[in-house]
């Protein structure tokens, strides 16, 4: 269910602004999206796992706040990220 180190490194390398960039909004949103996808798959197999459901909702809210921040500060990076991650643009 959790991302391993290799998957995280691959995501960071793809979305980082510069080398060893792990804190930018783009990287954080991409990592959250990967975790959300993983937990969503888990929830399809385990629909009664309510603690995972609450964790999923928390991650979705966190990603939503980060995306709102990125949209207001750097719209070009926001639109590029939405296209690459196949997310809805609100």
Swiss-Prot record:
Entry annotated with the keyword rRNA-binding: yes
PANTHER family cross-referenced by the UniProt entry: RIBOSOMAL PROTEIN S15, BACTERIAL AND ORGANELLAR, SMALL RIBOSOMAL SUBUNIT PROTEIN US15M
Family recorded in the similarity comment: Belongs to the universal ribosomal protein uS15 family.
SUPFAM superfamilies: S15/NS1 RNA-binding domain
GO CC terms of this entry: cytosolic small ribosomal subunit
Family matches, as Gene3D superfamilies: 6.10.250.3130, S15/NS1, RNA-binding
InterPro entries: Ribosomal_uS15 (IPR000589), Ribosomal_uS15_bac-type (IPR005290), uS15_NS1_RNA-bd_sf (IPR009068)
Recorded GO MF terms: rRNA binding; structural constituent of ribosome
Reported function: One of the primary rRNA binding proteins, it binds directly to 16S rRNA where it helps nucleate assembly of the platform of the 30S subunit by binding and bridging several RNA helices of the 16S rRNA. Forms an intersubunit bridge (bridge B4) with the 23S rRNA of the 50S subunit in the ribosome.
Keyword terms, alphabetized: Ribonucleoprotein, Ribosomal protein, RNA-binding, rRNA-binding
Source organism: Campylobacter hominis (strain ATCC BAA-381 / DSM 21671 / CCUG 45161 / LMG 19568 / NCTC 13146 / CH001A)
Subunit structure: Part of the 30S ribosomal subunit. Forms a bridge to the 50S subunit in the 70S ribosome, contacting the 23S rRNA.
Pfam families membership: Ribosomal_S15 (PF00312)
Protein name: Small ribosomal subunit protein uS15
A GO BP annotation: translation
């Amino acid at each position: 269910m959790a991302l391993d180190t290799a998957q995280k490194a691959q995501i960071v390398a793809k979305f980082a602004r510069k080398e060893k960039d792990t804190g930018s909004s783009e990287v954080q949103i991409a990592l959250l999206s990967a975790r959300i996808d993983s937990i969503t798959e888990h929830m399809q197999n385990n629909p009664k796992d309510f603690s995972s459901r609450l964790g999923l909702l928390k991650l979705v809210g966190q990603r939503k706040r980060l995306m709102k921040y990125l949209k207001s500060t750097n719209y070009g990076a926001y639109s590029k990220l939405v296209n690459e991650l196949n997310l809805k643009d609100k």
